[in-house]
């Protein structure tokens, strides 16, 4: 049974600091990547995925591992929001969401 654990339900970070978002996977799931999104629904934005360039974001532990914790450097007030760790299932055309973590609500203080 595959699960994504996001141990922090909420985090407070100071503007300009580095934000750490924790996510670990347990169990075996389908083939597919894990990515991070901010928000949920039609207006969510991808914060980090394996392919693509995300200059302020890096994985805390390099591949391959079941730890998908990321660090976002030089946090701005616009970074406030709820972040989800998302497991994708590889599809023929597009990857589809298999499961997601419980979400971490991020507050940024100036």
Q: What residue ranges belong to the model's regions?
A:
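Extracellular/luminal immunoglobulin-like beta-sandwich modules
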Residues: 76-78, 82-110
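N-terminal edge beta-strand
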Residues: 1-22
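Extracellular beta-strand/loop-rich beta-sandwich domains predominantly from IgSF
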Residues: 9-11, 55-80, 90-92
